[in-house]
Amino acid sequence: MSSEKQPFYEENGRMYHAYRKGVYMLPCDEQEQDRLDIFHKLFTVARVSDGLMYAPHPRNGRFLDLGCGTGIWAIDVANKYPDAFVVGVDLAPIQPSNHPKNCEFYAPFDFESPWAMGEDSWDLIHLQMMFGNGQTGQRLPAMASPPHDSYYSQSLASSRSRNNSDAMDIYAITDRDPPAREPSGYSQWYRNGSPSVNSIHSKSSEKQPFYEENGRMYHAYRKGVYMLPCDEQEQDRLDIFHKLFTVARVSDGLMYAPHPRNGRFLDLGCGTGIWAIDVANKYPDAFVVGVDLAPIQPSNHPKNCEFYAPFDFESPWAMGEDSWDLIHLQMGCGSVMGWPNLYRRIFAHLRPGAWFEQVEIDFEPRCDDRPLEGLAIRQWYQYLKQATQDAMRPINHNSRDTIRDLQEAGFTDIDHQMVGLPLNPWHQDEHERKVARWYNLAVSESIESLSMAPFSRIFNWDLDRIRRISSEVKSEAFNKEIHAYNILHIYQARKPAN
């Protein structure tokens, strides 16, 4: 993800990045990139043992590289740990495009601006050569200056500790338990997918599971990963969308993908659990599991249905590879950082020949009989798109990218359906009008929920401004003279039988 504007400019014969011009005082041309890679090589040689990091870390963990430069450290870590997920961020978009599949880069990204990357969610955060480039000492108090006076008089082990190197590995910026001590009730799964006796229960956070922000309740597990609330108002909104999807589908309202009636179904980001409960009621011989970051699922669910929360499906799973007959994901855009990595994980957990189904809404407003430029609904979507991109969990949806990522993950027989979602019942067709009535209700309940955290956290908007644009969007959504619509995308993809 790079800047849409010209990303570089020339000064004194050298090239500098143009994003937040002047923040970083070093160039970013090819000569500078060579210099950064030379320093990376120096650090790997200067370290006594592991040339990449000293801090304890899991081999399948989540690694974040701040100010990644050319991305060389992130790429080396991704190649060393193929089961890990590595993200590099930088002001300048100078990272290669041919990086490992378990590695992602986001630029331009200013890590001295507010983040929305998920608190309590990273196993290791790495920062290298940042002194002199902003107020990182104030932002990251773990960055202590090395004791220069007695450097060579110390023992070798001490002089090479991570506290005495500018190549810093920040293991725990936030107050979090080491990975081995995190909630483990949902990770007690055998490889064949059969849950252990101790894991058959709904798992919730041992810490306070929710916190309040701008008058709405959000889940506290890995705070900030998911930018939508989880209070009763939000739960009603999710259930309305579930109803909308069942109405918008032509035939089976729950899923299109082939599936056995007595199969094993996994619902990722299950929300209130309504889809999982409906499937469990429809197929009493099936076994249905729903996982979510927020423990908001009901306790009175069917006996053949289980919920596990908090559960971050972008972190490593232990739920039985090759064991699920269908994996379902609904409205994941805006909450996922690395789609290719997630698709590979889904692929690994499906039985050979089993199916994955994904349902997404493309919120970009469309209209066939008039331009929407200048309308609040168009401006709102552009703001939402930018805010979620800055948070590295974009809400905008691209079907070509989705199909490509599914193919690269190994899926075959990919089917893609598109359904129009009118914002109000302006259409003459009765089925379209029924869909529109449900979608109008869903949108009216969604504008403020979708806007609150992205606009306040990323743009620092106050509540009055957020509510004002939300009200304008709702007014246009109710206006039958504006024939706007969104697109519902439904994908089915099969894991090959062989």
Curated annotation (Swiss-Prot):
Subcellular location: Nucleus
Reaction catalysis annotation: L-methionyl-[protein] + S-adenosyl-L-methionine = S-methyl-L-methionyl-[protein] + S-adenosyl-L-homocysteine
Keywords for this protein: Methyltransferase, Nucleus, S-adenosyl-L-methionine, Sporulation, Transcription, Transcription regulation, Transferase
GO BP of this protein: methylation; sporulation resulting in formation of a cellular spore
E.C. numbers: 2.1.1.-
Phenotype of null mutants: Impairs kojik acid production.
Any matching Pfam family: Methyltransf_23
Induction: Expression is negatively regulated by hstD.
InterPro entries: SAM-dependent_MTases_sf
Enzyme class per UniProt: transferase
Molecular function (Gene Ontology), one example: methyltransferase activity
Entry GO terms, CC: nucleus
Quaternary state and interactors: Component of the heterotrimeric velvet complex composed of laeA, veA and velB; VeA acting as a bridging protein between laeA and velB.
Similarity annotation: Belongs to the methyltransferase superfamily. LaeA methyltransferase family.
Role description: Methyltransferase that performs automethylation. No other methyl-accepting substrate has been identified yet. Component of the velvet transcription factor complex that acts as a global regulator for secondary metabolite gene expression. Controls the expression of the kojic acid gene cluster, producing a secondary metabolite used as a skin-lightening agent, an antioxidant, and an antibiotic.
Protein name per UniProt: Secondary metabolism regulator laeA
Native source organism of the sequence: Aspergillus oryzae (strain ATCC 42149 / RIB 40)
